[in-house]
């Protein structure tokens, strides 16, 4: 029954839950004077975080937020045993650019008290940093900007300098060799620039969408596990009775043999649905209708992969 999970969202949409009244309301952030039951160490770190944010020292605030997110009290993250405290911390973490901590605290707060759901609190789980970069990448690649944001949220939690164990880089976690396929002049260091990384990510995702006839779930599986594996999974399922009448994302996701990819595809579809709800980019009657909601890029975009940004 949790609408912030893929299947919980599916159930809520199926039951025709209407979030419009709550999401139309933009509440101010939860009172930042909240103290709750904090340890002395948490209290000191929280004071430092607030002071750094007030002075506009975002880089230092981000480092303090990273430390604060790791400090535990009574077995829980700071504020996570109290709905308003969790949302207050989510807002501070978001201001500091620690979106991963913001996600988890906002999720905890809204799980404790669903009545606190509104445009402001939901946006702490589904923020849109670097939006101008994503919009520029969408214009160039032809892929919906909200889909690009949804991928970056899952890939890097919007951390521009993220580096994975496999050496995938930046917001959209691209391997340098993959980025070279679509932006031949890009360098490794370029991929830490949001403007370049989102362009490369958009162009590569467009390439996958084109290969899989605009099927978003298939393209996402390919983005995570590779196009060869995704194509094999598609082939394996082609004779499955439930797939003969049309593509069913639930069947496809449940049949993905890799647990990481199953979760990855479902989470991004959930992200995409919530971003559409929050930006009023259209009502959603089913997650299935998101499967082909992308516009094929005009011909002038077909040469974009050959050009440097």
Residue ranges and their predicted role:
Residues 39, 55-56:
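Loop-to-helix junctions at membrane interfaces in multi-pass transport proteins
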Residues 56-57, 97:
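Residue-level detector of the short coil/turn that links helix A to helix B
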């Amino acid at each position: 029954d949790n609408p912030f999970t893929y299947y919980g969202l599916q159930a809520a949409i199926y039951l025709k839950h209407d979030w419009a009244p709550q999401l139309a309301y933009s509440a101010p952030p939860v009172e930042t004077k909240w103290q709750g039951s904090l340890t002395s160490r948490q209290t000191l770190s929280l004071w430092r975080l607030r002071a750094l944010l007030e002075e506009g020292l975002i880089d230092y605030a981000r480092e303090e937020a990273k430390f604060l997110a790791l400090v535990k009290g009574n077995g829980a993250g700071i504020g996570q045993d109290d709905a308003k405290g969790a949302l207050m911390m989510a807002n501070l973490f978001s201001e500091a650019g620690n979106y991963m901590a913001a996600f988890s605290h906002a999720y905890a707060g809204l799980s404790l008290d669903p009545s606190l759901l509104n445009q402001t609190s939901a946006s702490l789980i589904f923020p849109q940093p670097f939006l101008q970069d994503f919009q520029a990448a969408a214009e160039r690649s032809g892929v919906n900007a909200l889909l690009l944001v949804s991928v970056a949220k899952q890939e890097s939690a919007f951390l521009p300098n993220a580096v994975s164990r496999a050496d995938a880089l930046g917001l959209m976690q691209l391997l340098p060799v993959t980025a070279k396929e679509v932006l031949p002049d890009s360098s490794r260091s370029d991929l830490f620039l949001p403007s370049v990384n989102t362009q490369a990510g958009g162009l590569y995702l467009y390439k996958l969408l084109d290969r899989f006839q605009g099927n978003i779930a298939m393209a996402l599986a390919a983005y995570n596990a590779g196009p060869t594996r995704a194509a094999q999974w598609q082939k394996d399922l082609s004779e499955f009775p439930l797939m003969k009448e049309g593509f069913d994302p639930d069947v496809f996701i449940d049949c993905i043999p890799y647990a990481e990819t199953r979760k990855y595809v479902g989470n991004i579809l959930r992200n995409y649905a919530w971003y559409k709800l929050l930006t009023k980019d259209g009502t959603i009657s089913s997650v299935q209708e998101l499967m082909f909601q992308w516009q094929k890029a005009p011909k002038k975009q077909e040469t974009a992969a050959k050009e440097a940004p």
